[in-house]
From Swiss-Prot:
Disulfide bonds: none annotated. Keywords: ATP-binding, Chaperone, Nucleotide-binding, Phosphoprotein, Stress response. This is Chaperone protein DnaK. Residues 611-631 have a biased composition (Low complexity). It comes from Cupriavidus taiwanensis (strain DSM 17343 / BCRC 17206 / CCUG 44338 / CIP 107171 / LMG 19424 / R1) (Ralstonia taiwanensis (strain LMG 19424)). The modification Phosphothreonine is found at T200. The lineage of its organism: Bacteria, Pseudomonadati, Pseudomonadota, Betaproteobacteria, Burkholderiales. Belongs to the heat shock protein 70 family. Acts as a chaperone. Induction: By stress conditions e.g. heat shock. Residues 638-647 have a biased composition (Basic and acidic residues). The keyword Ribonucleoprotein does not apply. Residues 611-647 are annotated as: Disordered.
Length: 647
């Protein structure tokens, strides 16, 4: 059985890890980096770039370069968070037929799971290149506060990328696994994982206990905001730069997509620099032009200015921390360790606020970029049976229930319930002789159903006529270890039953997923063909070069007819290499190899002759050298002594 890899599919960056024995290993990608930007670019010729190559060309191709797509995964187009992003993103966010938020690139509509699958495919390939074997299974992380639709969509992305997703695991829980596994403190420890990434924020309170030599990680509570992260911090800086430039130059850059892409890069760079220095300079020559000529942007920014711009965003993370502490039934003083995860936690002001709230310094021995992928890899080794000393008890982040009479949300499973879990409750009809009931499933904390997220609905039909309140309909909720919900309804009188896995009344249908899997496989096939063609062209170029060189040196030893034959074969191979037919190139490579066989024999004979001459000269030289050797030795000795004397 192959390894189960751990993937941190991040909003801004992604990371892949495995366990080698008991040691976690974060794998470098083909560019030599341990994290990969979650950026995907669709080129004019149909090529898809992922990671650093996509990021490098973003400035010149902003409409077809997708980033922060995780913010759209499993979301409806009409959701206010999505509507907010529409005005900020240089690429086009559109409404799919099922009401989901999709993106439009080069005249084709793409579902967010389809786009995220490109990043997952790169992670899969990174692991395969390192392991030297195919990888088919993975544990993928999601923000703890992701709802059912978002988890389902992430699982779909894995399938489209050709991965069997063995488990969806919460990011803070994964970080806790990475942190707690090698710690040998005895007794129970309560830790708070504060995870502020590129697009999402999570806080989890987790208890690590030693139970008969087994490490037990129990999530006591979780909270967060799935639309708050580094991208929002960048946006505050971008808005500030736009405002300053407008005041200074009278030009509004917010409508210029090329300028916006450059501003995004500059904002991210300034934010990172201000974590280690007090001031930075944002310098963007030729940012735009008007009738008076080109305009340059030059702006100094201090750490204090940045902190004032994002203060409200940092403060927004504290309320979920309060709720999580309360839900866990602990006091702030009970927390033994605070772990920071996600790139944004490198910001000194964030660290300061966390210290202020928890009353203690956060641990510095956790890598905020890699801990989540490492934790996912550890969970992978637990699932494959390689590790038997770890038990993970996670929770569902939000309450789940159904709509009952009067539009009330009747909770079936309350938030922070340990998963997997099951719950059943008996309901009845609201009208006399009602032949069917519609079960509407919601997720959220509001008292009225409409204030929560509708995950899906289904009917139970064929209920025998009876006065209202008489039929007994048992509704059962079952959450699996991925946090994905399965719901059933059964008429106790007739035994009639209907079960569904909540796929939301949006999400991707099985047919769509299968089509995307096929597209992805076709893409992989195209990539393979393109690679084979490139290899064939390289081989052709190398052969042409070496043959030409040999003709220049030894051509005078060939008969005129042989030389012409070689020249003709070179010309034919050059023509074939310019085309796109690999079979044709291979055939012409063979033809040139055959045509230049005589030439090869001449080269070989000449090399043999030269080697013979060198051998004779070498033997004579060796004798002379042996005679001179003792003197050489003395010279070297004297040199060493001289150096030692100086010391």
């Amino acid at each position: 059985m192959g390894k189960i890899i751990g993937i941190d599919l991040g909003t801004t960056n992604s990371c892949v890890a495995i366990l080698e024995g008991n040691t976690p290993k974060v794998i470098e990608n083909s560019e030599g980096a341990r994290t990969t930007p979650s950026i995907i670019a669709y080129m004019e010729d149909g090529e898809i770039l992922v990671g650093a190559p996509a990021k490098r060309q973003a400035v010149t191709n902003p409409r077809n370069t997708l980033y922060a797509v995780k913010r759209l995964i499993g979301r409806k187009f009409e959701e206010k968070e999505v509507q907010k992003d529409i005005g900020l993103m240089p690429y086009s966010i559109v409404k799919a037929d099922n009401g989901d938020a999709w993106v439009s690139v080069r005249d084709q509509k793409l579902a967010p799971p389809q786009v995220s699958a490109e990043v997952l495919r790169k992670m899969k390939k990174t692991a395969e290149d390192y392991l030297g074997e195919p990888v088919t299974e993975a544990v993928i992380t999601v923000p703890a506060y992701f709802n059912d639709s978002q988890r389902q969509a992430t699982k779909d992305a894995g399938r489209i990328a050709g991965l069997d997703v063995k488990r969806i695991i919460n990011e803070p829980t994964a970080a806790a696994l990475a942190f707690g596994l090698d710690k040998n403190e005895k007794g129970d420890r309560k830790i708070a994982v504060y995870d502020l990434g590129g697009g999402t924020f999570d806080i989890s309170i987790i208890e690590i206990a030693d139970v008969d030599g087994e490490k037990q990680f129990e999530v006591l509570s979780t909270n967060g905001d799935t639309f708050l992260g580094g991208e929002d911090f960048d946006q505050r800086i971008i808005d500030y730069i736009i405002g300053e430039f407008k005041k200074d130059q009278g030009v509004d850059l917010s409508k210029d997509v090329l300028a916006l892409q450059r501003l995004k890069e500059a904002a991210e760079k300034a934010k990172i620099e201000l974590s280690s220095s007090q001031q930075t300079e944002i310098n963007l020559p030729y940012i735009t032009a008007d009738a008076s000529g080109p305009k340059h942007l030059n702006l100094k920014m201090t750490r204090a200015k940045l902190e004032s711009l994002v203060e409200e965003l940092i403060t927004r993370t504290i309320e979920p921390c309060r709720t999580a502490i309360k839900d866990a039934g602990v006091k702030v003083s009970d927390i033994d360790d605070v772990i920071l995860v996600g790139g944004m936690t490198r910001m000194p002001k964030v660290q300061e606020q966390v210290k202020e709230f928890f009353g203690k310094e956060a641990r510095k021995d956790v890598n905020p970029d890699e801990a989540v992928a490492v934790g996912a890899a550890i969970q992978g080794s637990v699932l494959s049976g390689d590790r038997k000393d770890v038990l993970l008890l996670d929770v569902t982040p939000l309450s789940l229930g159904i709509e009952t009479l009067g539009g009330v949300m009747t909770k079936m499973i309350t938030k922070n319930t340990t998963i997997p879990t099951k719950h059943a409750q008996v309901f009845s009809t609201a009208d006399d002789n009602q032949p069917a009931v519609t079960i509407k499933v919601y997720q959220g904390e509001r008292e009225m159903a409409t204030g929560n997220k509708l995950l899906g609905e289904f009917n139970l039909e064929g209920i025998p006529p009876a006065p209202r309140g008489t039929p007994q309909i048992e509704v059962s909720f079952d959450i699996d270890a991925n946090g994905i919900l399965h719901v059933g309804a059964k008429d106790k009188a007739t035994g009639k039953e209907n079960r569904i896995t909540i796929k939301a009344n949006s999400g991707l249908s099985e047919d769509e997923i299968q089509r995307m899997v096929k597209d992805a496989e076709a893409n992989a096939e195209e990539d393979k063909k393109a690679r084979e063609l490139a290899d064939a062209r390289n081989q052709a170029d190398a052969l042409i070069h070496s043959t030409r060189k040999a003709v220049t040196e030894y051509g005078d030893k060939l008969e005129a007819g042989e030389k012409e034959k070689i020249e003709a074969a070179i010309k034919e191979l050059e023509d074939a290499a310019r085309g796109g037919d690999k079979t044709e190139i291979d055939a012409k490579v063979n033809a040139l190899s055959e045509a230049s066989q005589k030439l090869g024999e001449k080269v070989y004979a000449d090399m043999q002759a030269k080697a013979g001459e060198q051998g004779a000269a070498g033997a004579a030289g060796a004798g002379a050298q042996q005679q001179a050797q003792p003197q050489d030795d003395n010279v070297v000795d004297a040199e060493f002594k001289e150096v030692n004397d100086k010391k």
